[in-house]
Amino acid sequence: MDKRLWVGVVSIFPEMFRAISDYGITSRAVKQGLLTLTCWNPRVYTEDRHQTVDDRPFGGGPGMVMKIKPLEGALADARQAAGGRKAKVIYLSPQGRQLTQAGVRELAEEEALILIAGRYEGIDERFIEEHVDEEWSIGDYVLSGGELPAMVLVDAVTRLLPGALGHADSAEEDSFTDGLLDCPHYTRPEVYADKRVPEVLLSGNHEHIRRWRLQQALGRTWERRADLLDSRSLSGEEQKLLAEYIRQRDDS
């Protein structure tokens, strides 16, 4: 049976998620039935005419905090829509576990996700304690809300659904999939601004091309994200290719 993913999003700006449902690979996954994406707006679950979803924080301080009841109403309907699927509830938060490709692979194993996109200064901590299974962050910086991180997560996970990409090998060759940055890529013309496409890529020798791409990925990772190599065990071939890359770089 094909792997399919159901995603529910709780957000006061559901329109933002048209960027996911209407464009690119994620849109194609929706049309293929691989990805189901539905949004619930907490404002619908308010009881005042202003549809208030936030209030002042206890203890004072700047900003507002999202109230529990509207979030609970939206979450309850999202859970019901998930049907018999076991949905993991995720809050996008700067305090969460940082999203990496390894984490994306973990999330891609789930059958259903409910993503809580906060706003303002955040959401009432008691909602998190009562309802949230995991908190995830996309980096050590501050955004205006959880919608963009939620879209990043959905896009990254969708790429791993079988059939979502046009080429079966595309996801496996992405940066970080094997713990390395990606190698350089080239297309026509062969010469641009006196810079030629590397001859090995024009050779037609698949083994030479494979080794060149692996060496470039190793070298680029060593130059730009050496920390990734600290957590990765290099094979004998990889050690030789990286040593050769460094030697050629030092000689140039």
UniProtKB/Swiss-Prot annotation:
Question: What EC number(s) has UniProt assigned to this enzyme?
Answer: 2.1.1.228
Q: Where in the cell is it found?
A: Cytoplasm
Which Gene Ontology terms cover its molecular function? tRNA (guanine(37)-N1)-methyltransferase activity
Which Gene3D superfamilies does this chain map to? 3.40.1280.10, tRNA(m1g37)methyltransferase, domain 2 (1.10.1270.20)
**Could you tell me which Pfam families the record lists for this protein?**
tRNA_m1G_MT (PF01746)
Q: Which CDD domains match?
A: TrmD-like
Task: List the disulfide bonds in this chain.
Answer: none
Q: Name one GO biological process term.
A: tRNA N1-guanine methylation
Q: Top-level EC class, please?
A: transferase
Question: Which residues bind S-adenosyl-L-methionine per the record?
Answer: 118, 138-143
Please write the reaction equations for the catalytic activity of this protein.
guanosine(37) in tRNA + S-adenosyl-L-methionine = N(1)-methylguanosine(37) in tRNA + S-adenosyl-L-homocysteine + H(+)
GO CC annotations, alphabetized? cytosol
InterPro entries recorded for this chain?
Alpha/beta_knot_MTases (IPR029028), tRNA_m1G_MeTrfase_C_sf (IPR023148), tRNA_m1G_MeTrfase_TrmD (IPR002649), tRNA_m1G_MTases_N (IPR029026), tRNA_MeTrfase_TRMD/TRM10 (IPR016009)
Protein keywords: Cytoplasm, Methyltransferase, S-adenosyl-L-methionine, Transferase, tRNA processing
Read off the PANTHER family from this record.
Answer: TRNA (GUANINE-N(1)-)-METHYLTRANSFERASE
Role: Specifically methylates guanosine-37 in various tRNAs.
NCBIfam families reported in the protein's UniProt record: PRK00026.1 (NF000648), trmD (TIGR00088)
Write out the similarity annotation: Belongs to the RNA methyltransferase TrmD family.
Assembly state and interactors? Homodimer.
Q: What is this protein called?
A: tRNA (guanine-N(1)-)-methyltransferase
What is the organism of origin for this protein? Pseudomonas aeruginosa (strain UCBPP-PA14)
Organism taxonomic ancestry:
Bacteria, Pseudomonadati, Pseudomonadota, Gammaproteobacteria, Pseudomonadales
Gene, per the UniProt record: trmD
